A protein has these predicted regions:
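Bacterial N-terminal signal peptides that target proteins for export
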Residues: 1-11
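Bacterial N-terminal signal peptides
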Residues: 9-20
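Short, surface-exposed linear motifs at loops/turns and structural transition points
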Residues: 23
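Mature catalytic domains of secreted/periplasmic carbohydrate-active enzymes
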Residues: 27-524
Length: 524
């Protein structure tokens, strides 16, 4: 057999370390200091992975949640007519909780009420039956018949065939699995007749013209938040829909005050306009580490969470086939970890309460990877900044263990099946093409290796290994001048058959806390 050698080279530059991960765990707002918030944020900082669930009447026809009628892509009566089809016949919260646990997530957030104003719990707050046409000339303005029974709350309990609270059993199922429960709640409510907005081009009234009407809505909204607080004691409140009004108009201080009165350990996302605990970028992967902006307009706190769909929509859409692959999700998750953040990955169950097999498979694949690499994930701190390492990194809390995430190559090894060497070589060449490496050689007798290079590391490496694989790597230091303070360059040859099928993680145990050289080189 012809001897060919194959080497994949990764450049890993160690340049800097983000410190103080937990010191600013919450936003400094009026009456709340970062120091007083930080301890209760510990579980969130350590959790790293959560599952987001968008579920509501929009799953009946697979329409865009709330936005479809708000943007007039469908009529309001058609949208609200989905109430009659929401049955949740196959809903089993214990099955959901088991799958979430298997994914490696430490918490889950579910939509208790989206912008459409339909509650998924047994709320006792009444929603006036609103005219869906705002035109004075429209004969249907008075709306006959009504879209729901205004003598009963606008909820799936009172107005749909489901006839049950779907939030309470889910919260219980999560806690039975040792998971934290998060409640998504939309501040705005386009179905409430006392809320100013309805359509994107036309509202019911202007707040300044009818402040008493707005106060009636606030009483309704604060009443619902109070119900969620006292009935379910959420570990996390995930607010949304804040953009249509200011924090003064929402009375955000009261929201926070009331929640903490019911549960002092509850945390809130950053969509309370100055009264939340962590930043919440959406969909798009940040390049630099997000920070929470306080009431003073300055950055406060370092905790953040990326919320992201598993396909292109939050709720179930039958025509959305653009599922993210497990490899893509894991690589995105790795990037979040490298910047000290969390990933809140969304799924959208069907109206009957079942989760699609595509999303089930995604969560199971995620679970395989998280269980294998748990020590590099949970409780880790942000690693090196971007620009000098082609892949994220994390460190242990005592800074003596460095984890390198090799995201630039999709695994080729024990997790993938190839019939023969020709197929294996073809797969390798395909992967190398993706990373732009033109140095391609194969060695059928000596095996395949991936060469990882680390520079700027002052510490002695006590041991190096591939997480989840037996055996040790042999770091080699080159270019170290005995009389210079500039450290040498570290090379490690990683067997290709030790690579994970998604993202491989290397564990470097260091002598002492991580110490990095950040100079320009030369004779120092």
């Amino acid at each position: 057999m012809k001897r060919i050698r194959h080497s994949v080279v990764f450049l890993v530059g160690l340049m800097g370390l983000v410190q103080g991960f937990f010191g600013g765990g919450g936003l400094m707002a009026k009456g709340f200091s970062a120091d007083s918030i930080a301890p209760k944020m510990q579980w969130f900082a350590d959790a790293k992975l959560g599952i987001f669930i968008h579920w509501g009447i929009y799953a009946v026809e697979g329409t865009s949640e709330s936005w479809s009628f708000h943007s007039r892509n469908t009529t309001y009566p058609y949208y609200m007519g989905q109430l009659k089809g929401f049955g949740a016949e196959k809903y089993d919260p214990k099955v959901w909780a088991t799958l979430i646990k298997e994914s490696g997530a430490q918490y889950a957030v579910i939509t208790t009420q989206h912008h459409d104003g339909v509650a998924l719990w047994n709320t006792q707050q009444l929603t006036p039956n609103t005219p869906w046409s705002l035109s004075a000339k429209d004969p249907l303005k008075m709306q006959k018949p009504a879209l729901w029974n205004a003598k009963l709350p606008l909820s799936v309990v009172a107005q749909s065939p489901a006839k049950r609270d779907v939030i309470a059993p889910f919260a219980s199922a999560l806690r039975e699995k040792g998971l934290k429960f998060g409640a998504y709640y939309s501040l705005l409510d386009w179905s409430h007749n006392d809320y100013p907005g309805l359509y994107n081009d036309q509202g019911r009234y202007k707040l300044a013209e009818d402040p008493m009407r707005w106060q009636r809505f606030l009483q309704f909204m604060h009443g619902q938040i109070g119900e969620l607080s006292t009935q379910f004691h959420p570990d996390l409140f995930w607010f949304d829909g804040d953009w249509e009004h200011s924090n003064e108009e929402w009375n955000a201080p009261k929201i926070r005050r009331d929640i903490l009165a019911a549960n002092p350990n509850a945390i809130m996302n950053g969509r309370l306009q100055g009264y939340g605990d962590y930043a919440t970028p959406e969909q798009n992967m940040p390049i630099s580490r997000p920070t929470l902006i306080g009431l003073d307009g300055k950055a406060h706190g370092t905790l953040w969470e990326l919320c992201m769909t598993s396909n292109d929509n939050w709720g179930w859409r039958p025509n959305d086939t653009l599922m993210k692959t497990s490899n893509e999700v894991i690589r995105i998750f790795s990037e979040c970890l490298g910047m000290g953040g969390n990933l809140l990955l969304d799924i959208g169950p069907k109206a009957d309460g079942t989760i699609t097999w595509e999303q089930t498979r995604l969560l199971k694949d995620l679970g395989r990877w998280t269980s294998k690499h748990a020590e590099a994930i949970y409780g880790s701190l942000a690693g090196m900044p971007a620009g000098h390492f082609y892949g994220p990194s994390t460190i242990s809390k005592d800074s003596t263990i460095l984890y390198l995430f090799l995201t630039q190559v999709q695994g080729i090894g024990k997790d993938d099946k190839y019939i023969n060497e020709e197929e294996l070589e073809e797969a390798i060449n395909e992967v190398l093409g993706k990373v732009g490496d033109d140095h391609i050689e194969l060695d059928g007798s000596s095996g395949l290796t991936c060469s990882v290079m680390v520079k700027g590391l002052r510490n002695e490496i006590l041991s190096a290994e591939v997480l989840g694989v037996e055996g040790k790597l042999r770091p080699k230091v080159v270019g170290k001048i005995s009389w210079s303070s500039v450290p040498g360059t570290v090379f490690m040859e990683v067997p290709v058959d030790a690579l994970d099928s998604d993202v491989t993680v290397l564990k470097l145990k260091l002598k002492g806390p991580l110490s990095l050289y950040r100079g320009a080189g030369g004779f120092h």
